[in-house]
Swiss-Prot record:
The modification Phosphothreonine is found at residue 173. This is Chaperone protein DnaK. Residues 596-613 have a biased composition (Acidic residues). It comes from Listeria monocytogenes serotype 4b (strain F2365). CDD domains: ASKHA_NBD_HSP70_DnaK-like. Acts as a chaperone. Residues 578-591 have a biased composition (Low complexity). Induction: By stress conditions e.g. heat shock. PANTHER family: HEAT SHOCK PROTEIN 70KDA (PTHR19375).
Length: 613
């Protein structure tokens, strides 16, 4: 069975891992880094992904980052006149991860386990699966990030039973999961979180502070200047990271903008104390989900054996201090917060292929599922933190006499009223025979698969008529749309490959022109003038072709010039060899005389030496 890669598709950074020799290994990207920025840029019809796109963001307005925050919504990015859904942008990132994983493994990769925040709803999970499909990946499993982290942490600790709390604060989302580990079973007891809390929010607090300080000093609002804002974003992220290791950092942005008197510079010293003050409310927001997870698992802080930190934002000292204070124990520092999720996904891939044995993963659904019933109430069928896969049925009836159809409004959430919860989808069970209200028996069944994706079925028990849907949110893509996006992605991959080949062809042609000029100088007076003119004409033709975009012509002229230069070089070497041979022959005739003279003199000198001795 082909290898299944594990992908952590993050808000700010992504990573890919594979199981090798029973161990999960992070695959470095072409730049040698172990994580790749989740950034996509479009420039002159070309796509850039990762560090290249992130570096160019200051000057390229067509740069997209943190797209994960829009997964499962109708959000669209319009770039160069074309609309892109979050699934398509995510697919571009996945395609890039897939391509360098293939280069590393030396084989085609078409299967993956992709992680999502535990608190992702059905629409967000479905969107992630669609992104994988667009990227040319068969998504074998969608796995929760904290669960993946627990897998990576607990693989070598299966002998002892322990309860662990995974605290996952990434670039855009926050999750807390509590798991029981023992005898190779990883059982999730509860999960809670906040999909709108992450490192991006900490960065924004610094940006807002810098904008306010600059406005106070100079009367100019930098938030209206796109280029300045991008520079502030990069500086804020760097300052945040610096303050995890030092207590004060200097933010210096020369020529950030211009005033009436000329260029203006931003110089601010940010202390850790000020950063903690700015982000205090964000850190506080991690406490409620942590307490909720403990409550749902019927545990207290003292029942937790180990606290695992996941996500780059857990490096913030105030975050670590809050966890320590809340749970009364030092967090475990033995895992890399940026890599552990991808490694866990790779291990899950190994479980699927059978390379990892004696491991059972029991995850839960993060939010309750139900339908809207009379009075706009949400009636829950599956409670949150129910182990998945699972299914549940309940019988309902009509609300009016002779009601011909029932609308099934599928909901996900914890609020008592339907309008306050997330709509997953709607469908209708029609052709119900006329009957007084309360008589027809309508059975509604919910199924949640191992990926946390929901199927709902409604059946009229009287007629046996049935209707079912795999939930597609309002943002969900149809099979036709996905197929079109798959084709677009494949075409783009081909185009990217072609662009790379064309760039290499152009570089080789440029190099050849340079080499020819050098060679012709060396050949002056050594080969016939006619041969030199022929080479110069071919060189000029290639230079002319290089001014255009006809790559077939460039290729043809390059090959033609190459052939002429090779023939010239052969003639030069033949001529040099002939000259050497002629010189060698002349030396051969003179050599005996010279040898006699030298030998005679040498003999005499030696004799004199002997006599002197």
């Amino acid at each position: 069975m082909s290898k299944i890669i594990g992908i952590d598709l993050g808000t700010t950074n992504s990573a890919v891992a594979v199981l090798e020799g029973g161990e999960a290994k992070i695959i470095p990207n072409p730049e040698g880094a172990r994580t790749t920025p989740s950034v996509v840029g479009f420039k002159n019809g070309e796509r850039q992904v990762g560090e290249v796109a992130k570096r160019a963001a200051i000057t390229n307005p067509n740069t997209i980052s943190s797209i994960k925050r829009h997964m499962g919504t109708n959000y669209k990015e319009t770039i160069e006149g074309k609309d892109y859904s979050p699934q398509e942008i995510s697919a571009i990132i996945l395609q890039y991860l897939k391509s360098y994983a293939e280069d590393y493994l030396g084989e085609t990769v078409d299967k993956a386990v992709i992680t999502v925040p535990a608190y992702f709803n059905d629409a967000q999970r479905q969107a992630t699966k669609d992104a994988g499909k667009i990227a040319g990946l068969e998504v074998e499993r969608i796995i929760n990030e904290p669960t993946a982290a627990a897998l990576a942490y607990g693989m070598d600790k299966t002998e002892t039973d322990q309860t662990i709390l995974v605290f996952d604060l990434g670039g855009g989302t926050f999750d807390v999961s509590i798991l029981e580990l023992g005898d190779g079973v990883f059982e999730v007891h509860s999960t809670a979180g906040d999909n709108e809390l992450g490192g991006d929010d900490f960065d924004k607090k610094i940006i807002d502070y810098l904008v306010a300080e600059f406005k106070k000093d100079n009367g100019i609002d930098l938030s209206q200047d796109k280029m300045a804002l991008q520079r502030l974003k990069d500086a804020a992220e760097k300052a945040k990271k610096d303050l995890s290791g030092v207590t004060s950092t200097q933010i210096s942005l020369p020529f950030i903008t211009a005033g009436e008197a000329g260029p203006l510079h931003l110089e601010v010293t940010l202390t850790r104390a000020k950063f903690d003050e700015l982000t205090h409310d964000l850190v506080e927001r991690t406490i409620a989900p942590t307490r909720q997870a403990l409550k749902d698992a019927n545990l207290s802080a003292s029942d937790i054996d180990q606290v695992i930190l996941v996500g780059g934002s857990t490096r913030i000292p105030a975050v670590q201090e809050t966890i320590k204070k809340e749970l009364g124990k030092e967090p475990h520092k033995g895992v890399n917060p940026d890599e552990v999720v991808a490694m866990g996904a790779a291990i899950q891939g190994g479980v699927i292929t059978g390379d990892v044995k004696d491991v059972v993963l029991l995850d839960v659904t993060p939010l309750s599922l139900g339908i809207e019933t009379m009075g706009g109430v949400m009636t829950t069928l599956i409670e949150r933190n129910t182990t998945i896969p699972t299914s549940k049925s309940q019988t309902f009836s009509t609300a009016a006499d002779n009601q011909p159809a029932v609308d099934i409004h599928v909901l996900q959430g914890e609020r008592p009223m339907a309008k306050d919860n997330k709509t997953l989808g709607r469908f209708q069970l029609a052709d119900i025979p006329p009957a007084p209200r309360g008589i027809p028996q309508i059975e509604v069944s919910f199924d949640i698969d191992k990926n946390g994706i929901v199927t709902v079925r409604a059946k009229d028990l009287g007629t046996g008529k049935e209707q079912n849907i795999v939930i597609k949110s309002s943002s969900g893509l149809t099979d036709e749309e996905i197929e079109k996006m798959v084709q677009d992605a494949e075409a783009n991959a081909e185009e990217d490959k072609k662009n790379k080949e064309n760039a290499e062809l152009r570089n080789n042609a440029d190099q050849l022109v340079f080499t020819v000029d050098k060679t012709l100088k060396e050949l002056e007076g050594k080969v016939e003038e006619e041969e030199v003119k022929k080479a110069e004409a071919a060189r000029d033709e290639l230079q002319e072709a290089l001014k255009g975009e006809d790559f077939e012509a460039i290729k043809e002229k390059t090959e033609s010039l190459n052939e002429i230069v090779q023939n010239l070089s052969v003639k030069l070497y033949e001529q040099a060899a002939a000259e050497q041979q002629a010189a060698g022959g002349a030396e051969g005739q003179e050599a005996p005389q010279n040898d006699d003279v030298v030998d005679a003199e040498f003999e005499e000198v030696n004799d004199d030496d002997k006599e002197n001795k």
